[in-house]
Amino acid sequence: MGYISMSVVAFLVVFASPVVLATDTDPIPENRAQIPQWFKTNVKPYSQRKGTLDPALEAAEAARQIITVNQKGGANFKTLNEAIKSIPTGNKNRVIIKLAPGVYNEKVTIDIARPFITLLGQPGAETVLTYHGTAAQYGTVESATLIVWAEYFQAAHLTIKNTAPMPKPGSQGQALAMRINADKAAFYSCRFHGFQDTLCDDKGNHFFKDCYIEGTYDFIFGRGASLYLNTQLHAVGDGLRVITAQGRQSATEQNGYTFVHCKVTGTGTGIYLGRSWMSHPKVVYAFTEMTSVVNPSGWRENLNRGYDKTVFYGEYKCFGPGSHLEKRVPYTQDIDKNEVTPFLTLGYIKGSTWLLPPPKY
């Protein structure tokens, strides 16, 4: 056998080995300025992730298709519903639906047989999907302007609204902007507007980055396992205001909400970070700015006896006038670095094998 230099061997080993460029163990840094680099390191594009993604996702990304939508014409379709219906059931390719700026007054459902869809708005422009469904008309979770049942969904640079009026106390006024009931979904620079039950983060692993979510009561609810990064949570109006109603129902369920480097704002006072809608909710806020609108007690037991012993409500290194723990309810978890770390990684949403950055417009 001929002589092969060690440098050549090293070269061959590097280029023959699988490239693992995302990790489920690297925590989001405490320094907000380091978020872009953390994201760039851990959420690289498909072209640099071959051999590390879910096989079905990798195959889909290798066969991308683009569909254009413009209400004014000059595109493949004039409505989003027409574009979605054009995608065959059993779809196996990444289909990027590029929406021209404008207001699309449509109620849209992406069914389970159409995975790998991306809804892409133009950065810096206003692309709005809006409808006015209510619980009285459709039932609570079916009232959403956008409902997604299909895996590997993405949305970027979109505003999703439910324009039904703010409900009166005691009325059946739930009106969702979005329901995500599918695994492995990501949202980038999206805005969700509604009042009660704005975002049904219903089921599956989800990632939200650079988003804005607005509502009144339980405006993020469901049983998703979700990581919210650099997202503003804004409560509107006065009276009882609650951000989360996380729906975990047993200690063995692997779901919950984590808010990292987020900001809690509002127009009223006394906002609760969450309430015990179900018996075992799990919600963590880390490195999050809490303005004076946050209720000093922080969390609401919802008059369910015994739930104070089964909830997991954690806060870690939050700041601002609403972040002080002295007056928090006794079941608030003032967690330490070791306890919070699992909530700060992509491992919380099993993200290293499916999470991809948004495509360019």
Swiss-Prot record:
Tissue: Expressed in flower buds.
Entry GO terms, CC: extracellular region
Signal peptide coordinates: 1-22
EC number of this enzyme: 3.1.1.11
Residues engaged in binding substrate: 174, 275, 277
Family, similarity comment: Belongs to the pectinesterase family.
Protein's name according to its UniProt entry: Probable pectinesterase 50
Species in which this protein is naturally found: Arabidopsis thaliana
Organism placement in taxonomy: Eukaryota, Viridiplantae, Streptophyta, Embryophyta, Tracheophyta
